[in-house]
Curated annotation (Swiss-Prot):
Organism of this sequence: Demansia vestigiata
Site (Reactive bond for chymotrypsin): M41, G42
GO cellular component, as recorded: extracellular space
SS bonds (residue pairs): C31-C81, C40-C64, C56-C77
Cellular localization per UniProt: Secreted
Descriptive protein name: Kunitz-type serine protease inhibitor vestiginin-1
BPTI/Kunitz inhibitor domain segment(s): 31-81
Length: 83
């Protein structure tokens, strides 16, 4: 196989790996935790993974001391937890 063909194959495999969703067996355990507002009194939009709906949802975060199922962006939540 030529070097161009190998590069194309490598590129396709990399793309496939990036687009393959997280399976439930590979999902971190903290993705199962309920949303946690934290102990501070702020009003920041954050996202958490909801396992019963199998998707990331917004919630209001107080700004500190929450559990790890707390993401600044929807994309970060999906990349980490969504299948």
């Amino acid at each position: 196989m030529s070097s161009g063909g190998l590069l194309l194959l490598l590129g396709l495999l990399t793309l496939w790996a990036e687009l393959t969703p997280v399976s439930s067996k590979d999902r971190p355990e903290f993705c199962e935790l309920p949303p946690d507002r934290g102990t501070c009194m702020g009003f920041l939009q954050a996202f958490y993974y909801n396992p019963s709906q199998n998707k990331c949802l917004p919630f209001m975060f107080g700004g500190c001391k929450a559990n790890p199922n707390n993401f600044k962006t929807l994309e970060e939540c999906k990349r980490t937890c969504a299948a």
